[in-house]
Swiss-Prot record:
Task performed by this protein: Usually encoded in the trnK tRNA gene intron. Probably assists in splicing its own and other chloroplast group II introns.
First and last residue of the signal peptide: none
PANTHER family: MATURASE K (PTHR34811:SF1)
Protein's name according to its UniProt entry: Maturase K
UniProt gene name: matK
Organism: Rhodotypos scandens
Cell compartments where the protein resides: Plastid, Chloroplast
Family: Belongs to the intron maturase 2 family. MatK subfamily.
Keyword tRNA processing appears in the UniProt entry: yes
Any single Gene Ontology cellular-component annotation: chloroplast
């Protein structure tokens, strides 16, 4: 294991990250305020004329230590921060600025990683849709898939210990420990998703920072194992993992960890060029071409390593290995599965001809119609059966605002589900939104749907066209075949970075 020592050592320059003095800089809090992650405008409630100075921050830190303002309960997350006194005010103010400060070394390493790998359009790799072309290319050659929930730490202190190998500033980490470890009382007696929800609502930026560092530490195990058994380098890994090293756990160096957990007799199990990993929304996918026995080896080795040496909670019994041809994945809003694509090929050799049936596997991405209708029913666009209804809360708005809201939602859904291999479900969603829009307008003008449609005609339906549909209708006004081919084809957009709520206007 001596050849791994240079790989496992901490970077020298990381030892010179002194971030604590930045806590007392006014522009840090102005920067955190401009990001707008917390819309409650916390600085307005302090009475210091929207400015943060050295004296103000010292007072806030002193009050945090002297008074019990860090206890977070379920009632605090629903408290109106505009009314009265908010006991989490001080911690929220400083945690926002502190999160911006700790992000500085991460941003610098990301920029240096992009420059080293000569990645020009890294924003394309951050798109949600960029995952699907990868799956289309790799999944037809794989046999088994496992949907794994990313393990969570057994205590918030683990998040601080993970972050201390990224940020070499004890003073800053002591303050981070104050925000994290003392902010949750009786951690072991509470349910983790509930704590995650409360903590993310009260300190969203700080929570994302801690969670991303935890995920990066969790994924560094996979990158470490892969890099040891393949001579070629992975350029893309430098973008997502700026740190790839391990450290001592319970006085045992990492060399002994791998020597004990992965003896030489079983290391060949990891020499699998067809093992692929994808992460999404707190879950991850492990897919392989191997037999189930080897995948089970992967599962138990990784789970044991995560539990014993990364202090995270994960159970092998909750990880299921499924045959890819018989299993569908609920993946980023799509139902993805493998289906055979049959084709007939005729081969001519001299005077003889042969007809051969070729069956090729193809990734099938479907629109989840039932969950989408449930979401539309939840925000009162239709009932539980999918029948459109009027949006009564929007009836007081102008006609332009009503149409604009419906059109925006319809176009966003069409944009996101443009990669669907079957568009009939998407057409039904568009129909619900169009008719709901008409019913809302008819309700506002105290008219019937039929009368209102006669008055507007086809102008209203044209508003619901996407940009691509509108351009094609102008180029080919009489040719419907081109539009049909466009609807059938799958298009993945590289400008989608998050999945917004259907309705975010209210």
């Amino acid at each position: 294991m001596e050849e791994f020592q240079g790989y496992l050592e901490l970077d020298r320059y990381q030892q010179h990250d002194f971030l604590y003095p930045l806590i007392f800089r006014e522009y840090i809090y102005a920067l955190a305020h401009d990001h707008g992650l917390n819309r409650s405008i916390l600085l307005d409630n302090v009475g210091y004329d929207n400015k943060s100075s050295l004296l103000i921050i010292k007072r806030l830190i002193s009050r945090m230590y002297q008074q019990n303002h860090l206890i977070i309960s379920a009632n605090d997350s629903n408290q109106n921060k505009f009314l009265g006194y908010n006991k989490n005010l001080y911690s929220q103010m400083i945690s926002e600025g502190f999160a911006v400060i700790v992000e500085i070394p991460f941003s610098l390493r990301l920029v240096s990683s992009l420059e080293a790998t000569e990645v020009v359009k890294s924003y394309n790799l951050r798109s949600i849709h960029s995952i699907f072309p990868f799956l289309e290319d790799k999944f037809p050659h794989l046999n088994y898939v496992s949907d794994v929930l990313i393990p969570y730490p057994i205590h918030l202190e683990i998040l601080v210990q993970t972050l201390r190998y990224w940020v070499k500033d004890p003073s800053s980490l002591h303050l981070l420990r104050l925000f994290s470890s003392r902010s949750i009382i009786n951690w072991n007696s509470l349910y983790y998703p509930k704590i995650k929800y409360i903590f993310s609502k009260s300190n969203p930026r700080l929570f994302l920072l801690l969670y991303n560092s935890h995920v990066c530490e969790y994924e560094s195990i996979l990158v470490f194992l892969r890099n040891q058994f393949f001579s070629f380098t992975i350029n893309s890994s430098g973008i997502f993992f700026e740190r790839i090293h391990f450290y001592e756990k319970i006085k045992y160096p990492v060399e002994q960890v791998f020597a004990n957990d992965f003896p030489a007799a079983v290391l060949w199990f990891f020499k699998d060029p067809f093992m692929h990993y994808v992460r999404y929304q707190g879950k991850s996918i492990l897919a392989s071409k191997d037999i189930p026995l080897l995948i089970n080896k992967w599962k138990y080795y990784l789970v044991n390593l995560w539990q014993c040496h990364s202090y995270v909670w994960s159970q092998p019994g909750t990880i299921y290995i499924n045959q890819l041809s018989k299993h569908s994945l609920d993946f980023l809003g799509y139902f993805s599965s493998m289906r055979p694509n049959l084709s007939v090929v005729r081969s001519q050799m001299l005077e003889n001809s042969f007809i051969m049936d070729n069956a090729m596997k193809k990734l099938d991405t479907l629109v989840p119609i039932i969950p989408l209708i449930g979401s539309l029913a939840k925000v009162k666009f239709c009932n539980a059966l999918g029948h459109p209804i009027s949006k009564s809360t929007w009836a007081d708005s102008s006609d332009f605002d009503i149409i604009d809201r419906f059109v925006r939602i319809c176009r966003n859904l069409s944009h996101y589900y443009s990669g669907s291999s079957r568009k009939k479900s998407l057409y039904r969603i568009k129909y619900i939104l169009r008719l709901s829009c008409v019913k809302t307008l008819a309700r506002k003008h105290k008219s019937t749907v039929r009368t209102f449609l006669k008055r507007l005609g086809s102008k209203l339906l044209e508003e619901f066209f996407t940009e691509e549909e509108h351009i094609l209708s102008l180029i080919f006004p009489r040719a419907s075949y081109t539009l049909k081919q466009f609807y059938r084809g799958r298009v993945w957009y590289l400008d989608i970075f998050c999945i917004n709520d259907l309705v975010n206007h209210e």
